[in-house]
């Protein structure tokens, strides 16, 4: 009799997972398979689409990398130091989660535009942020910013100070302690945060459509290209591009996870 509650619980979880995630993906590919394969291939390999794929992956990778570096620094400061306004800063980290992405894009465009507070300063040196790839990168960094911090924070908080003190007592310098004691403990969480940040940036739409020019071969990303295809009633094109992005995301995440597994087995 004890098996039945477990079976019911597992069945509910499987059904939830299937209807929420698996079924929509299966339906997407079934709709694509109903069309002529030459047309599907033409849509998938269109030069504009290929350019959008490459730019999306490139900018998402850069955004995750930037967030990993600065996210680690911010997490270290929040967990290791006490200062006035620390609680406010800690709460503000989650702001991108709550803020609608279109509002985020509008805010970034206002601040970093040619007439904005920061954008006008860069404009004096002939450097434009909005309506360029830099704007796309900035939007991706903003929306994926909290993931690295929230992944690293619990690990740093639970790390025992005695490990560092033991390393210092054995004559290790601060850098050696960080490299040989602290960093190996943080690597799994850092990789997880990088992966989550990359995944979030890869699918961003709302803020990018507000801050970029959305022109092909310039700063057009895959999510905006899908929206443009839907506006033109090109449902096949939107479905194919969406499927390609899905496969790219899946392949990239599997690659990152495989690298993570191999690294921590050694």
Curated annotation (Swiss-Prot):
It is a multi-pass membrane protein. InterPro entries: CysT_permease, MetI-like, MetI-like_sf, Sulph_transpt2. Residues 53-257 form the ABC transmembrane type-1 domain. It is found in: Plastid, Chloroplast membrane. The keyword S-adenosyl-L-methionine does not apply. Disulfide bonds: none annotated. Its main location: plastid. The keyword Nucleotide-binding does not apply. The chain crosses the membrane at residues 12-32, 59-79, 91-111, 129-149, 181-201, 206-226, 236-256. It comes from the Eukaryota. GO terms for molecular function: ABC-type sulfate transporter activity. Keywords: Chloroplast, Membrane, Plastid, Sulfate transport, Transmembrane, Transmembrane helix, Transport. Pfam families: BPD_transp_1. Belongs to the binding-protein-dependent transport system permease family. CysTW subfamily. Part of the ABC transporter complex cysAWTP (TC 3.A.1.6.1) involved in sulfate/thiosulfate import. Probably responsible for the translocation of the substrate across the membrane. This is Probable sulfate transport system permease protein cysT. It comes from Chlorella vulgaris (Green alga). The lineage of its organism: Eukaryota, Viridiplantae, Chlorophyta, core chlorophytes, Trebouxiophyceae.
């Amino acid at each position: 009799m004890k098996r039945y509650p477990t079976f019911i619980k597992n069945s509910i979880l499987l059904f939830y997972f299937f209807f929420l995630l698996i079924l929509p993906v299966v339906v997407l590919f079934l709709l694509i398979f109903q069309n002529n394969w030459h047309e599907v291939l033409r849509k998938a390999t269109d030069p504009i689409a290929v350019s959008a794929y490459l730019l999306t992956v490139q900018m998402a990778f850069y955004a995750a990398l930037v967030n990993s570096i600065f996210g680690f620094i911010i997490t270290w400061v929040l967990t290791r130091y006490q200062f006035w306004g620390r609680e406010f800063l800690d709460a503000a980290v989650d702001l991108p989660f709550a803020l609608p992405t279109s509002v985020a894009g509008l805010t970034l465009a206002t601040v970093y535009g040619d007439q904005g507070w920061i954008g006008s300063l860069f404009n004096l040196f002939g450097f434009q942020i909005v309506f360029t790839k830099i704007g796309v990168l900035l939007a991706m960094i903003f929306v994926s910013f909290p993931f690295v911090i929230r992944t690293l924070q619990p690990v740093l908080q639970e790390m025992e100070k005695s490990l560092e003190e033991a390393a210092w007592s054995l004559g290790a310098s601060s850098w050696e302690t960080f490299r040989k004691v602290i960093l190996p403990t943080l690597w799994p969480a850092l990789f997880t945060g990088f992966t989550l940040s990359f995944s979030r940036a890869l699918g961003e739409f709302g803020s990018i459509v507000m801050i970029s020019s959305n022109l092909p071969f310039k700063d057009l990303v895959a999510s905006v290209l899908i929206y443009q295809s839907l506006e033109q009633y090109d449902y096949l094109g939107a479905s194919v591009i969406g499927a390609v992005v899905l496969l790219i995301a899946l392949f990239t995440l599997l690659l990152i996870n495989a690298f993570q597994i191999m690294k921590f087995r050694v």
